[in-house]
């Protein structure tokens, strides 16, 4: 079973028609500076390891200039997180995120269900593990039909998405569900889904 680093996951999502920030992976401080120059504005420099809590581990930083991106990449590439050395950084455009959401598709192996399950919350971000269970909405998906639009609208409404945004969020979730099914994923998690405008 393949496990993706963040940049690999974003490449995969982009190929599936999902919106992702402009960015590229870099293996050296010099490459990070080059990518930041190509982006042409403030960037996020994000260490690439298969571990949670990267923000708290200090391997996700913001830079205003290519020179800052180079210095931060040098610092991040010298670190180890949960025993894993950081060998690459993702340098991507810094977005002005107004609101964060959480979404995952997993296999529900309970005896009653044995089906894909969507988990969605309007409370995404670094501390998703501490979010109250009542704010994490779960829905068992019919394996034959996938996530249907009206079910996606329903779960978004329950999560507190504004009525005028229900169609957009539901469309996003149904596209993700289709990718999850198409590639026979065991798990597809996005934390966080960022919204630049509210």
Residue ranges of model-derived segments:
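A conserved helix-loop-beta module that forms one wall/lid of the active-site cleft
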Residues: 1-41
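ATP-grasp fold ATP-binding core
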Residues: 6-8, 12-13, 38-54, 83-97, ...
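A long amphipathic alpha-helix within ATP-dependent nucleotide-binding catalytic cores
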Residues: 151-193
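Glycine-rich phosphate-binding loop of ATP-grasp-fold ATP-dependent ligases
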Residues: 20-23, 45-72, 102, 115, ...
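Cap/lid and interdomain-hinge subdomains that line or gate substrate/regulatory clefts
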Residues: 124-169
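Hydrophobic alpha-helical hairpins/lids featuring a short glycine-rich hinge
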Residues: 82-140
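Conserved small/polar residues in nucleotide/adenosyl-binding loops
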Residues: 196-198
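Active-site cofactor/substrate anionic-group-binding motifs, chiefly glycine-
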Residues: 38-44, 62-86, 123-126
């Amino acid at each position: 079973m393949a496990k993706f680093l963040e940049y690999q996951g974003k490449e995969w999502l982009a190929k599936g028609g999902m919106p992702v920030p402009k960015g590229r992976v870099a293996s050296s401080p010099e490459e990070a500076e080059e990518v930041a120059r190509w982006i042409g504005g403030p960037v996020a420099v994000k260490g690439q390891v298969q571990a949670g809590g990267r923000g708290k581990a200090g391997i996700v930083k913001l830079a205003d200039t290519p020179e800052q991106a180079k210095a931060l990449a040098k610092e991040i590439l010298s670190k180890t997180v949960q025993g894993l050395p950081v060998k690459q950084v993702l340098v991507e455009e810094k977005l002005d995120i107004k609101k964060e959401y959480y979404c995952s598709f997993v296999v529900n192996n309970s005896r009653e269900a044995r089906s894909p399950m969507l988990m969605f919350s309007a409370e995404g971000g670094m501390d998703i593990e501490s979010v109250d269970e009542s704010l994490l909405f779960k829905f068992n998906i019919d394996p034959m039909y996938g996530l249907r639009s009206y079910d996606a609208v329903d779960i978004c409404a329950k999560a507190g998405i504004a009525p005028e945004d229900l169609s957009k969020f539901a469309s996003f979730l149904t596209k993700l569900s289709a990718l999850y099914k198409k590639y026979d994923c065991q798990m597809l998690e996005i934390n966080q889904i960022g919204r630049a405008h509210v």
